[in-house]
UniProtKB/Swiss-Prot annotation:
It is an enzyme of class 2 (transferase). This is Acetylornithine aminotransferase. It catalyses: N(2)-acetyl-L-ornithine + 2-oxoglutarate = N-acetyl-L-glutamate 5-semialdehyde + L-glutamate. Belongs to the class-III pyridoxal-phosphate-dependent aminotransferase family. ArgD subfamily. It comes from Bacillus cereus (strain ATCC 14579 / DSM 31 / CCUG 7414 / JCM 2152 / NBRC 15305 / NCIMB 9373 / NCTC 2599 / NRRL B-3711). The lineage of its organism: Bacteria, Bacillati, Bacillota, Bacilli, Bacillales.
Length: 386
């Protein structure tokens, strides 16, 4: 069949028609264990009953109205996002790229400066601003010239950070775990030094939690585990559990820098998105839920290390919460395909890392099942190495 779609994705031929919890079913009736969560989107699993109920009820009332009018649902969700943290204001949008664009605009407007420091191998989006911020050449090929005033330093390199920081820097933007860059957690000392230098030079500290946010690492936001206070946090992906919604969250001192007309979004924060986000947050903020995520993350990481430690092709296993990377000594495309054949959906992060992003509602039994399948595949001599 002739496709009328731009070929912007390296799509697999499989098509899914049903999803419930951690499982999805293709159009031939085969069931899969989904350890992609739609690339970290469906943290509560597919068709979560609480989120489904909230969205269905909202569909009967009102779907969308202009942001020129009051929306109390936005206020409710904003309160849930800022509760018990040193962040006071929220701007709602539709995606992680939009949230990061808003953060970059706010940083420049608030500080009056233009230079932004980010990290090599980072990923912040595909708009011109966020693409310029991203530290991966493959994302930028063919789209130049990009926006000036972005510096990219090696991830976790304090010396490189110290060399570029000065009074001209508007902001430093960093991920707590580089997801697209290979599932590489940030060093605590690196984050602390960013905070110190931003305070010293009057720069804003932006943390991109688009993939790590909403409980993925065992706290609502990953940065909460390391005792720092960023000026801006961005979030999207899991905030709507499949309904497009993003948010840029800023400190109180930034509140006067975005005024009427200085930024906006037609669809951002509409009623359907807010209905989903409200239910997602009410589930994801529960201490018992987050504790289980931490425990399951520790459990599966330990199981993977135990089962794969002597496998020749495995170089490293790392992660934070239920965000895990299995680094191999060669490219993993053939592994990804074979895992799919065995009924396990996983992701690739760079050429040689298998990325696991299971729904946070996953059971220990399902984690064990995934570990078994992964071990079976990586130990199979018939898997081609490319």
């Amino acid at each position: 069949m002739t496709s009328h779609l731009f070929q912007t994705y390296g799509r697999r031929t499989i098509e899914f028609v049903k999803g419930t919890g951690t499982k999805v079913i293709d159009n031939k009736g085969k069931e899969y264990l989904d350890f992609t969560s739609g690339i970290g989107v469906c943290n509560l699993g597919h068709c979560h009953p609480t989120v489904l109920k909230g969205v269905q009820e909202q569909l009967d009332d009102i779907w969308h109205i202009s942001n020129l009018f009051t929306n109390s649902l936005q206020e409710e969700v904003a309160s849930l996002l800022t509760e018990n943290r040193a962040l006071d204001y929220v701007f709602f949008c539709n995606s992680g790229a939009e949230a990061n664009e808003a953060a970059l605009k706010l940083a420049r407007k608030h500080t009056g400066k233009s230079l932004v420091v980010t990290c090599q191998q980072s990923f912040h989006g595909r708009t011109f601003g966020t693409m310029s911020a991203t530290g991966q050449d493959k994302v930028k090929e063919g789209f130049g010239p990009l926006l000036p005033s972005f510096l990219h330093i090696p991830f976790n390199d304090i010396k490189a950070l110290e060399e570029v920081m000065n009074e001209e820097v508007a902001a430093v933007m960093v991920e707590v775990v580089q997801g697209e860059g290979g599932v590489i957690p940030v060093d605590l000392s690196f984050l602390k030094e960013i905070e110190t230098l931003c305070n010293k030079f009057g720069s804003l500290f932006i943390i991109d939690e688009v993939q790590t946010g909403i409980g993925r690492t065992g706290t609502l936001f990953a940065y909460e585990q390391v005792g720092i206070e960023p000026d801006i946090v961005t979030v999207a992906k899991a905030l709507g559990n499949g309904i497009p919604v993003g948010a840029m969250i800023g400190g109180k001192e930034l509140g006067t820098s975005f005024t009427a007309g200085s930024h906006g979004s037609t669809f951002g924060g509409n009623y359907i998105a807010m209905a989903a986000a409200k239910e997602v947050l009410q589930v994801s903020k529960k201490p018992s839920f987050l504790k289980e995520v931490q425990e399951k993350g520790e459990y599966v990481l330990e199981k993977l290390q135990e089962e794969l430690q002597h496998v020749e092709c495995i170089q490293n296993i790392r992660g934070k919460g239920l965000m895990i990377g299995i680094e191999c000594k060669h490219e993993v495309a053939s592994f990804i395909e074979q895992l799919e054949n065995e009924g396990l959906l996983v992701l690739q992060a760079g050429p040689n890392v298998i990325r696991l992003l299971p729904p946070l509602i996953v059971t220990n039994e399902e984690l064990e099942q995934a570990v078994y399948i992964i071990k079976k595949v990586v130990c199979t001599k018939n898997v081609s190495i490319i």
